[in-house]
Amino acid sequence: MAHITSWHYGNAIALLVSLAPGALSLNTFPDCSSGPLSKLAVCDTSLDVTTRAQSLVNAMTFEEKVNNTQYNSPGVPRLGLPAYNWWSEALHGVAGSPGVEFADSGPFSYATSFPQPILLGATFDDDLIKQVATVVSTEGRAFGNAGRSGLDFWTPNINPFRDARWGRGQETPGEDPLHVSRYVYHLVDGLQNGIGPANPKVVATCKHFAAYDLEDWNGVVRHSFNAEVSTQDLSEFYLPPFKSCARDARVDAVMCSYNALNGVPACADSYLLQTILREHWKWDEPGRWITSDCGAIDDIYNGHNFTTTPAEAAATALNAGTDLDCGTVFPKYLGQAADEGLYSNQTLDRALVRLYSSLVKLGYFDPAEDQPYRSIGWTDVDTPAAEALAHKAAGEGIVLLKNDKTLPLKAKGTLALIGPYANATKQMQGNYEGPAKYIRTLLWAATQAGYDVKYAAGTAINTNSTAGFDAALSAAKQADVVVYAGGIDNTIEAEGRDRTTIAWPGNQVNLIDQLSKIGKPLVVVQFGGGQVDDSSLLSNPRVNALLWAGYPSQEGGSAIFDILTGKTAPAGRLPVTQYPADYVNQVPMTDMALRPGSNTPGRTYRWYDKAVLPFGFGLHYTTFKISWPRRALGPYNTAALVSRSPKNVPIDRAAFDTFHIQVTNTGKTTSDYVALLFLKTTDAGPKPYPLKTLVGYTRAKQIKPGEKRSVDIEVSLGSLARTAENGDLVLYPGRYTLEVDVGESQYPTASFTVTGKETILDSFPQPPKTR
């Protein structure tokens, strides 16, 4: 097994090469029992976090301080402070990265590989997300305790999936801000083991702050891209997941992004990092720190031309609130910047105290016997329970897009398994992956399911060669049923690689069409994070069933065949809109606006209504009937709603109401059901009105045939409110309709009225007039 899997900060590879040897050396815990460090207050566990960290920083020389502002911090040998690599990754499992060292074999040569976040998002299962994060943090802590990773991990990616062309959309849970916000809340809870714990298991890092969702599109690259975003869209769409992460889940780290926001590079933007993040969201507790994305501080000078020298770039980022450089600008140029009087010693100390306060909270300087997480080890990695959870997560996320009752497959027999994913392994992991103990391929799973399998790749992901068609068609003719497995992969979508088309690549649709003409039942399994236009498959009556499986990782093949054979009933929902292929010709990727314009059609399900398949779509092997016990709700009054809200939580998180629906399984198959609750209005607040807005969801588990289940969906005041042009969150009086989207065009509704006056729930900080 490879020493370290590929990691995907593609443009940072040259940066790594330029750093001193030892970037992949094992981390070690400091010795606080003897030696020079033991004489410092940082080793005194009776003191508060800040005092301990400050004592360490006070003991450093200026040069030592500057040297330790980079991600691959060399430590201070003179003080007995070991080197520490801050850059460890764990997007969907401990992942290959400069701070993580996998062994060649044996212990610590692999970790559990969960589905990519885009497939986890399709589960709409908050409890599952926390369970996955808990396992990831346990395994991350095991690697950290063994000196094979840091104790902080640069995950999750919570930029909403705005544009289907984005190469990193696979790393996110979807396009809806509420959904992404709930995802990150439960994920951070699981990773850090609590909401703002005094002693986190690991430190999570929410990225990329903010308005980052472009890699390289038609020559426009992330390192110099200026995202022009209205204050309304910033507050309503781009920032809510970060508010949930920082203010509500109380994450300990945030990463600022490559792009500029309205002319100011994110890592140099005090409006973002100080005014919004640290002040408005009150993200100011000890041990909260900000890292740049890798090379982003260099981009301030080289990409954005925001400063005239790299020393100015270093000082500008430090003054704005960036504490750590994933790069070399800080250690190379902060000395020069100090000589030029561009920042104060107190500002440098502030950054280092934040960083080392984080390590103090993690127990890095404490005796191992006093730290509950230091006992976590190799036996806690990839346990049978973790493998079962990976299987469950993949199965819960898979979405059934089409089915003419061909699925579930009725019997064994001969099965033709065709396509570039038919025997895929690492391909099913997506990016930011680590070595897995095993990866269950579709070919393996089909054999395990008892089928006589005729396998042929047929074609590749993106080729016009038809050399494999004959073998594929021959296999299909010999079979009772045909399963085609294809879609897109990291050669099409990845970090540094956006798409220019959202059609199926290469000649895959051509092969599927030829397979459909053979006359055998044909099932298509579509892989990839971003959606492709399935119009031709949906309209072809000879394509009998269609599934979307995202990147299901190590349990992919077995989870998919559990769905195909009916062992598991599909209940996932699309976490994004599937756009027609021509959509890319209607709006440039650089257009950050969500609402329709004079020449643009709008983005996401809230503003675009011509989807091939809408956000939240998903079929089942059974049928459900939805009813409202009460069709007439309320009325509600704005003043009463605000006055009854508890004072110890932000008012936008306060409860509006809990809505009860009856879900009856009217079919013959036990199945989960994801209840998605949308809100509509045509008179509450100013125009334009969104088509609908997700305000709540829940996943009801294992509803049996004939069973009637009462399902409760909680809605917050913030979900009821709308965002004004100046970014304020406003509760408007008016008439509202609630709609349950059940995926089969049945939309039971209930209505209510809100009376009273317009009420501001959150006054959004206004950007500086000089921007």
From Swiss-Prot:
A Pfam short name:
Fn3-like
Residues the record marks as active site: 293
InterPro entries documented for this protein = BXL, Fn3-like, Glyco_hydro_3_C, Glyco_hydro_3_C_sf, Glyco_hydro_3_N, Glyco_hydro_3_N_sf, Glycoside_hydrolase_SF, Ig-like_fold
The molecular function terms in GO held by this entry are:
alpha-L-arabinofuranosidase activity; xylan 1,4-beta-xylosidase activity
Q: What is its EC number?
A: 3.2.1.37
What keywords appear on the UniProt entry? Carbohydrate metabolism, Glycoprotein, Glycosidase, Hydrolase, Polysaccharide degradation, Secreted, Signal, Xylan degradation
In what pathway does it function? Glycan degradation; xylan degradation
- Please give the GO cellular component terms listed in this UniProt entry: extracellular region
* Signal sequence segment: 1-25
Principal location: secreted
Q: Which reaction does it catalyse?
A: Hydrolysis of (1->4)-beta-D-xylans, to remove successive D-xylose residues from the non-reducing termini
Is Cell division among the key words of this record?
no
Q: What does this protein do?
A: Xylan 1,4-beta-xylosidase involved in the hydrolysis of xylan, a major structural heterogeneous polysaccharide found in plant biomass representing the second most abundant polysaccharide in the biosphere, after cellulose.
| Cross-referenced PANTHER family | BETA-D-XYLOSIDASE 5-RELATED, SUGAR HYDROLASE-RELATED
Its name, as the record gives it, is Probable exo-1,4-beta-xylosidase bxlB
Q: Which organism is it from?
A: Aspergillus fumigatus (strain ATCC MYA-4609 / CBS 101355 / FGSC A1100 / Af293)
UniProt gene name: bxlB
